Amino acid sequence: YQVLSSPRDWPSSAQQRCGWRSCPWSVENGGVPRSVFVHETIDIVGQGQYAYMEHVRGEPTNRMPGMTTLQGSFFVLGFGGGRWPQVVNIWDCGADGWEGWRRNLDRLNLKRRSAFYGDWWDEASRWRTGGYDRVCAGVPGSPTTEEIAERGIRGSLFVNEVFTVRPGTQVEFLAEVVDCRVPVFADHGVVATGLWE
Protein backbone atom coordinates (compact mmCIF):
# COMPACT_ATOMS: atom_id res chain seq x y z
CA TYR A 1 0.00 0.00 0.00
CA GLN A 2 1.29 3.44 -0.66
CA VAL A 3 -0.16 6.89 -0.44
CA LEU A 4 1.65 9.64 -2.27
CA SER A 5 2.05 12.67 0.04
CA SER A 6 4.06 13.62 3.11
CA PRO A 7 2.44 13.34 6.55
CA ARG A 8 2.69 15.96 9.27
CA ASP A 9 2.19 13.58 12.16
CA TRP A 10 1.45 9.93 12.88
CA PRO A 11 -1.23 9.20 15.52
CA SER A 12 0.27 7.58 18.61
CA SER A 13 -2.49 4.95 18.53
CA ALA A 14 -1.10 3.73 15.21
CA GLN A 15 2.48 3.24 16.38
CA GLN A 16 2.06 -0.36 17.53
CA ARG A 17 0.06 -2.79 15.39
CA CYS A 18 -0.04 -6.46 14.56
CA GLY A 19 3.06 -7.40 16.55
CA TRP A 20 5.39 -5.28 14.43
CA ARG A 21 7.79 -2.72 15.80
CA SER A 22 6.65 0.58 17.19
CA CYS A 23 8.59 3.31 15.48
CA PRO A 24 7.73 7.01 15.55
CA TRP A 25 8.94 8.18 12.16
CA SER A 26 9.85 11.77 12.88
CA VAL A 27 13.61 12.21 13.22
CA GLU A 28 12.96 15.74 14.51
CA ASN A 29 10.97 14.25 17.41
CA GLY A 30 13.83 11.93 18.36
CA GLY A 31 12.56 8.99 16.31
CA VAL A 32 14.57 6.70 14.09
CA PRO A 33 15.03 7.36 10.37
CA ARG A 34 12.13 6.12 8.24
CA SER A 35 12.64 3.20 5.93
CA VAL A 36 12.71 4.42 2.33
CA PHE A 37 11.85 2.36 -0.73
CA VAL A 38 11.84 2.95 -4.46
CA HIS A 39 8.81 1.42 -6.19
CA GLU A 40 9.64 1.00 -9.88
CA THR A 41 7.11 0.16 -12.57
CA ILE A 42 9.04 -0.99 -15.63
CA ASP A 43 7.61 -1.22 -19.17
CA ILE A 44 8.75 -4.52 -20.65
CA VAL A 45 9.53 -5.40 -24.27
CA GLY A 46 7.39 -8.32 -25.48
CA GLN A 47 7.58 -11.30 -23.14
CA GLY A 48 10.90 -10.23 -21.64
CA GLN A 49 9.66 -10.04 -18.04
CA TYR A 50 11.35 -13.26 -16.91
CA ALA A 51 14.73 -12.42 -18.43
CA TYR A 52 14.50 -8.87 -17.07
CA MET A 53 13.66 -10.03 -13.53
CA GLU A 54 16.61 -12.42 -13.62
CA HIS A 55 18.82 -9.56 -14.83
CA VAL A 56 17.56 -7.31 -12.00
CA ARG A 57 18.52 -9.93 -9.40
CA GLY A 58 22.10 -9.53 -10.65
CA GLU A 59 22.08 -5.73 -10.31
CA PRO A 60 25.70 -4.92 -9.32
CA THR A 61 25.03 -2.79 -6.23
CA ASN A 62 22.49 -5.24 -4.77
CA ARG A 63 25.21 -6.90 -2.69
CA MET A 64 27.25 -3.82 -1.79
CA PRO A 65 27.09 -2.49 1.78
CA GLY A 66 25.12 0.73 2.09
CA MET A 67 23.46 0.37 -1.31
CA THR A 68 19.91 -0.56 -2.29
CA THR A 69 18.68 -4.08 -1.77
CA LEU A 70 16.12 -5.66 -4.06
CA GLN A 71 13.15 -6.56 -1.86
CA GLY A 72 11.26 -8.11 -4.75
CA SER A 73 10.70 -8.18 -8.49
CA PHE A 74 7.21 -9.04 -9.75
CA PHE A 75 5.60 -9.20 -13.18
CA VAL A 76 2.10 -7.88 -13.80
CA LEU A 77 -0.29 -10.63 -14.83
CA GLY A 78 -2.08 -9.85 -18.08
CA PHE A 79 -5.25 -11.44 -16.74
CA GLY A 80 -4.96 -9.89 -13.27
CA GLY A 81 -5.95 -6.33 -14.09
CA GLY A 82 -3.68 -3.44 -14.86
CA ARG A 83 -1.31 -2.51 -17.64
CA TRP A 84 1.04 -5.14 -19.02
CA PRO A 85 3.65 -6.28 -19.82
CA GLN A 86 5.24 -4.66 -16.80
CA VAL A 87 7.52 -5.56 -13.92
CA VAL A 88 7.37 -3.97 -10.46
CA ASN A 89 10.66 -3.76 -8.54
CA ILE A 90 10.81 -2.80 -4.87
CA TRP A 91 14.22 -1.44 -3.76
CA ASP A 92 15.02 -0.96 -0.07
CA CYS A 93 17.33 2.02 0.47
CA GLY A 94 18.66 0.59 3.73
CA ALA A 95 18.69 1.41 7.42
CA ASP A 96 19.82 4.99 6.78
CA GLY A 97 16.43 5.97 5.34
CA TRP A 98 16.55 9.21 3.37
CA GLU A 99 20.35 9.36 3.61
CA GLY A 100 20.53 5.88 2.07
CA TRP A 101 18.27 7.05 -0.75
CA ARG A 102 20.48 10.12 -1.33
CA ARG A 103 23.64 7.98 -1.40
CA ASN A 104 22.09 5.57 -3.90
CA LEU A 105 20.82 8.43 -6.05
CA ASP A 106 24.33 9.90 -6.14
CA ARG A 107 25.79 6.68 -7.58
CA LEU A 108 23.48 6.99 -10.58
CA ASN A 109 24.97 10.21 -11.94
CA LEU A 110 26.69 9.91 -15.29
CA LYS A 111 30.25 10.06 -13.94
CA ARG A 112 29.72 7.30 -11.37
CA ARG A 113 27.31 5.09 -13.28
CA SER A 114 30.04 3.33 -15.25
CA ALA A 115 32.00 2.53 -12.10
CA PHE A 116 29.02 0.81 -10.47
CA TYR A 117 27.18 -0.66 -13.42
CA GLY A 118 29.49 -1.18 -16.38
CA ASP A 119 27.26 -2.54 -19.16
CA TRP A 120 24.37 -3.53 -16.84
CA TRP A 121 22.01 -0.74 -18.00
CA ASP A 122 22.76 -1.32 -21.68
CA GLU A 123 21.92 -4.99 -21.27
CA ALA A 124 18.75 -4.16 -19.30
CA SER A 125 17.50 -2.03 -22.21
CA ARG A 126 17.02 -5.22 -24.23
CA TRP A 127 13.99 -6.01 -22.03
CA ARG A 128 12.66 -2.60 -20.99
CA THR A 129 11.62 0.64 -22.65
CA GLY A 130 11.26 2.89 -19.62
CA GLY A 131 9.30 3.10 -16.43
CA TYR A 132 8.07 5.15 -13.53
CA ASP A 133 9.60 5.42 -10.04
CA ARG A 134 7.94 6.38 -6.78
CA VAL A 135 10.05 7.16 -3.72
CA CYS A 136 8.12 5.90 -0.69
CA ALA A 137 8.63 6.01 3.06
CA GLY A 138 7.53 3.22 5.37
CA VAL A 139 5.07 3.90 8.18
CA PRO A 140 4.57 2.18 11.55
CA GLY A 141 3.16 -1.28 10.90
CA SER A 142 5.15 -1.80 7.70
CA PRO A 143 7.78 -4.54 7.95
CA THR A 144 11.30 -3.86 6.76
CA THR A 145 13.03 -6.11 4.22
CA GLU A 146 14.98 -7.71 7.09
CA GLU A 147 11.77 -8.39 9.03
CA ILE A 148 10.18 -9.96 5.96
CA ALA A 149 13.18 -12.30 5.64
CA GLU A 150 13.24 -13.08 9.39
CA ARG A 151 9.54 -13.97 9.33
CA GLY A 152 10.03 -16.16 6.25
CA ILE A 153 7.39 -14.32 4.22
CA ARG A 154 7.30 -15.69 0.68
CA GLY A 155 4.64 -16.03 -1.96
CA SER A 156 3.84 -16.63 -5.58
CA LEU A 157 1.17 -13.91 -5.83
CA PHE A 158 1.58 -10.34 -4.56
CA VAL A 159 -1.16 -7.71 -4.73
CA ASN A 160 0.13 -4.21 -5.38
CA GLU A 161 -2.40 -1.48 -4.60
CA VAL A 162 -1.73 2.21 -5.15
CA PHE A 163 -4.29 4.61 -3.68
CA THR A 164 -4.80 8.32 -4.16
CA VAL A 165 -6.43 10.00 -1.17
CA ARG A 166 -7.45 13.52 -0.29
CA PRO A 167 -4.32 15.59 0.50
CA GLY A 168 -3.49 15.54 4.19
CA THR A 169 -5.38 12.30 4.92
CA GLN A 170 -2.71 9.76 3.94
CA VAL A 171 -1.62 9.10 7.55
CA GLU A 172 -5.19 8.56 8.71
CA PHE A 173 -5.84 6.30 5.72
CA LEU A 174 -2.78 4.14 6.35
CA ALA A 175 -3.62 3.92 10.06
CA GLU A 176 -7.04 2.56 9.03
CA VAL A 177 -5.35 0.06 6.70
CA VAL A 178 -3.20 -1.14 9.61
CA ASP A 179 -6.20 -1.22 11.98
CA CYS A 180 -8.83 -2.71 9.69
CA ARG A 181 -7.43 -4.36 6.55
CA VAL A 182 -4.22 -5.95 7.82
CA PRO A 183 -6.04 -8.10 10.45
CA VAL A 184 -8.69 -9.19 7.91
CA PHE A 185 -5.99 -10.13 5.41
CA ALA A 186 -4.11 -12.03 8.14
CA ASP A 187 -7.26 -14.08 8.85
CA HIS A 188 -7.02 -15.29 5.24
CA GLY A 189 -3.26 -15.94 5.22
CA VAL A 190 -2.36 -12.69 3.44
CA VAL A 191 0.51 -10.64 4.87
CA ALA A 192 1.21 -6.95 4.23
CA THR A 193 4.80 -6.64 3.01
CA GLY A 194 4.81 -2.89 2.51
CA LEU A 195 2.80 0.04 3.85
CA TRP A 196 4.30 3.15 2.33
CA GLU A 197 3.39 6.71 1.61
Question: What spans do the regions from the language model cover?
Answer:
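An amphipathic, aromatic/His-enriched active-site/gating alpha helix that lines ligand/cofactor pockets
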Residues: 1-24, 31, 50-74, 79-84, ...
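Residue-level detector of short, conserved catalytic/binding motifs and their immediate flanks
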Residues: 38, 85-87, 131, 159
